[in-house]
Regions:
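Beta-propeller and closely related beta-sheet repeat lectin domains
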Residues: 133, 140-143, 183-187, 234-238, ...
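Beta-propeller blade signature
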Residues: 159-167, 209-217, 262-270, 312-320, ...
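Small-residue hinge/turn detector
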Residues: 14-16, 40, 58-60
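Short, surface-exposed terminal/edge motifs of secreted or surface/virion proteins that either
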Residues: 1, 19-30, 63-74, 98-129
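Glycine-centered tight turns/hairpins at beta-strand boundaries that repeat
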Residues: 138-155, 166, 190-205, 216, ...
Length: 441
């Protein structure tokens, strides 16, 4: 083979550096495997770059240094608002400050409290209606459903649903009826409905398993929507979470000895479905007060039909799990087995109402610590036998009750959450009664 040594670029020629020790201009179209890291200086002409906004192209800024119009359909991890056809839920659990747009209503929300399971979404601009957790305390009305007018109880049952306003001292009004006259029922509350369940009706100890509901925002009769796990009554110990009603401690069956039970059961307050078992109390019991926080139910002051008849423990159980209740603390007194009262709840304390011959006690205990209750005042009338308990944002209420035959009461008492002291009589029920289901809205 002949090798031509020359500074002329051509086929079969050996390249000789020019007078500046540089390779003369040559065609590099066949060069391969050339690393881009070898280029450290100089510029690349725009014409040599395959630019555009389609697949495989290099994106080039326009004359105003802006990215040209292109599709962002496949972009990920880009911060921005959530767009949905519905409002955010309290268990969305975003980061604080997250923005949510309801593209159906046009409402815009910002998460201002990211507490897990209890988010608060604040409506912006001209929009109305924040999204926030439901709280047990009502702001409008207290309800009393059913009850008995006198002894013997079983021939004097009521089906009346009474309602009284928290904002005034007016008497209650009749707003509807239960599907059947009954007493010794349990009351529960939700954002839209109040509930009455269990108890017994005319004709002896005819225990029921009905769960009835009635609308908070209207005046209408109750409807039978579901069943408890078994027939039961003699419980005023109802508690309510944002989604469920809880019933703790009852007497069972339609035949003696009507034993107290340890069962805690729950039913949905947002859909119509039968109750399910939710665990056990620490101590089997019936009668007593029911109290609620956002996360736990409490029972206070109980009765038994065997020694010891008088039980002063406060029990606590979790809404989120079906573990056995804890013996949390004690009330100031252990009263007779027919002293059961409906309880009240502020956001920080439970209020238990106790009565009997010569006894009229209001106990207060903290939800946050295992501290025994303190006696903070008296009811306006000493009474017992299953009064209705209610809670507003500022007051607890105790209504109805019994002081011995034939003295069934119609009194509605109010107890301040802000200042310890005696209850004030603020109105009357439409019918004097005892052992009714209390609720609030």
């Amino acid at each position: 083979m002949t090798v031509n040594v020359t500074d002329t670029v051509g086929a079969n020629n050996t390249i000789v550096l020019d007078g500046n020790s540089k390779i003369p201009a040559i065609d590099g179209s066949q060069v391969t495997a050339l690393s881009a890291t070898a280029f450290t200086t100089g510029t690349l002409a725009t014409a040599r770059i395959d630019v555009g906004t389609t697949a495989g192209k290099v994106l080039q800024l326009d004359g105003s240094a802006r990215i040209p119009a292109l599709s962002g359909a496949n972009l990920t991890n880009v911060p921005g608002p959530t767009s949905s056809t519905s409002d955010p839920a309290i268990d969305t659990n975003p980061t604080l400050g997250k923005k949510w747009i309801n593209k159906t209503s046009g409402e815009v929300y910002i998460c201002t409290d990211a507490t897990a399971g209890a988010n608060v979404w604040t409506n912006l601009g001209a929009g109305t209606g924040d999204v926030q957790p439901w709280t047990y305390q009502g702001s409008n009305y207290g309800y009393n459903a059913g009850g008995a007018r006198q002894n013997p109880d079983h021939g004097n049952c009521l089906n009346t649903i009474d309602r009284f306003a928290f904002a005034s001292t007016a008497n209650a009004v009749d707003v509807g009826d239960l599907t059947v006259a009954q007493f010794n029922t349990v009351g529960n509350s939700s954002a839209s409905y109040s509930f009455s369940s269990g108890g017994y009706s005319t004709g002896g100890y005819n225990y029921q398993n009905k769960i009835e509901k009635y609308a908070n925002a209207s005046t209408a009769n109750a409807t039978d929507i579901a069943n408890l796990t078994e027939n039961k009554g003699d419980s005023t110990m109802g508690s309510s979470s944002p989604t469920h009603g809880f019933i703790a401690g009852v007497r069972l069956g339609n035949t003696a000895p009507y034993n107290p039970d340890v069962t805690i059961e729950k039913f949905s307050t947002v859909s119509d479905a039968n109750a399910v078992d939710h665990g056990d109390l620490h101590t089997a019991t019936w009668y007593g007060g029911g109290h609620s926080t956002v996360t736990h139910g409490f029972t206070s002051g109980h009765s038994n039909n065997a020694s010891p008849y008088y039980i002063n423990n406060i029990q606590r159980y979790a809404f989120a799990s079906n573990t056995t209740a804890t013996d949390w603390a004690n009330t100031t007194i252990a009263t007779n087995p027919y002293s059961g009262q409906g309880g009240s709840s502020s956001t920080t304390n439970g209020y238990a109402y106790f009565g009997g011959t010569g006894v009229s006690v209001i106990d207060k205990f903290p939800f946050a610590s295992q501290t025994n209750a303190s006696d903070i005042g008296d009811l306006s009338v000493h009474r017992w036998y299953g009064t209705g308990g209610h809670s507003s944002t500022t007051y607890g209420y105790s209504s109805g009750g019994w002081t011995g035959n034939p003295n069934v009461q119609n009194v509605i008492d109010k107890v301040s959450f802000a200042t310890d002291g005696n209850a004030t009589d603020v109105g009357d029920l439409t019918v004097a009664r005892k052992q009714q289901a209390g609720a609030n809205y």
